[in-house]
Amino acid sequence: MAILVTGGAGYIGSHTLVELLNENREIVVLDNLSNSSEVSLERVKQITGKSVKFYQGDILDRDILRKIFAENQIESVIHFAGLKAVGETSENRYVTIKNNVTGSIVLVEEMLKANVNTIVFSSSATVYGDPQIIPIVESCPVGGTTNPYGTSKYMVERILEDTVKAFPQLSAVVLRYFNRVGAHESGLIGEDPNGIPNNLMPFISQVAVGKLPQLSVFGGDYNTHDGTGVRDYIHVVDLALGHLKALDKHQNDAGFHVYNLGTGTGYSVLDMVKAFEAANGITIPYKVVDRRPGDIAVCYSAPQKALEQLGWETERGLEQMMKDTWNWQKNNPNGYKG
C-alpha cells in the first residue's frame, strides 16, 4: 500500500518524503511544480537511495487524480499542495481560493470515490488569526484570519470537519504548522522560493549568500521586546516527523483530529538575525520597513497535545536551524536552479 503526497516536491513535502522513505514507505507524489522543482525529488533519492513514483499535475485535475488512484494502491494522503506565501496570496484572493480550497474539495471527493479514507492536511497557525491567548492551544478560536492564505486553510479545515460528519469512515488529521525553517542536514534539500522570499529564513540566507543586499524587517513597532514580530520557529525535519506520527496514530482512525506543530517558544525577527549571525559567523545587514499587511505581533504554540497523543516533540534547537539553513543556502546559492 502507498501514500499519496500532494505537493511532495516542495519544501516541507520533500523533507517528509525523506522521513517516509527512511521507514520504507511506498510513496506516490503529485506536484504541479508551480513553486517547486523536480530536482528536489532527485535529491531525495540521493539522500535515501530510494525513488518515488511521480505524477506532474494539479489537484484540480480530476483525471490525474483518478489515474493515480487507479494505478496505485493508495491507503492514505498527505496533502501539502497549495499556494503558500502570505504575501503572494493577498494580491490574488481568487487564485488562492481556487487552488487551496477547491483543489482540496476535488482531492477529497476523488479519495472517497477510491475508498481512501485517511488524509493528513497541511494547515497553518494562521487559522488562529490575531490570537488573544498566548501560547496558542488547539481549542483557541479560529477563523478570524488576517490574510487569504489563512482564510483558505481555515475553510479547508471546516470542509474536512463537515466531510467527516457526512462520511464517518473518513479520518482527517489537521496539522497546524507554526513557522518552518531549516533544511536537511545533508544540505541537498531546502527552501527554494521563487523571487524575493516571503519567509524570514530564506530572506536572511539569501542576504548571507549575497543574492540580496539587506534584509527587510517588516515592522519595528510591535508590542514585543524589540519591536519586531515574534513567531514559533520549527525545524522542517521535526515538522516532517510530525506527519509520520500523525499518520501512524490516525490511519483509518475515523474522525476529525487537530494538532499544533511548534516548539512552544517564540523568537523575534531580530532574535533570529542574531542567532543566524552567531551560528554562522556572518553579519546580516537589515532595514526596518513598514509592516506587511496581514502580519500580527506574536504567535507561538502550546504543543502539549501532540506530545501527549502522538508522542511527538521537537528535537532540533535554534542553533541547528541556523546551521542547516546556511548549509543548504551556501551549497545551493541559486536553489535547485544550479
Swiss-Prot record:
Residues holding NAD(+): 11-12, 31-36, 58-59, 80-84, 99, 124, 149, 153, 178
Cofactor: NAD(+)
GO BP term, pick one: galactose metabolic process
A single GO cellular-component term on record: cytosol
Enzyme Commission number(s) of this protein: 5.1.3.2
InterPro entries: Epimerase_deHydtase, NAD(P)-bd_dom_sf, UDP_G4E
Recorded catalytic activity of this chain's protein: UDP-alpha-D-glucose = UDP-alpha-D-galactose
Domain of life (superkingdom): Bacteria
GO terms for MF: UDP-glucose 4-epimerase activity
Binding-site list for substrate: S124, Y149, N179, N199, L200, S216, V217, F218, R231, R292, P293, G294, D295
Active site per the UniProt annotation: Y149
Pfam families cross-referenced by the UniProt entry: Epimerase
UniProt similarity note: Belongs to the NAD(P)-dependent epimerase/dehydratase family.
Function according to Swiss-Prot or TrEMBL: Involved in the metabolism of galactose. Catalyzes the conversion of UDP-galactose (UDP-Gal) to UDP-glucose (UDP-Glc) through a mechanism involving the transient reduction of NAD.
Protein name: UDP-glucose 4-epimerase
Gene: galE
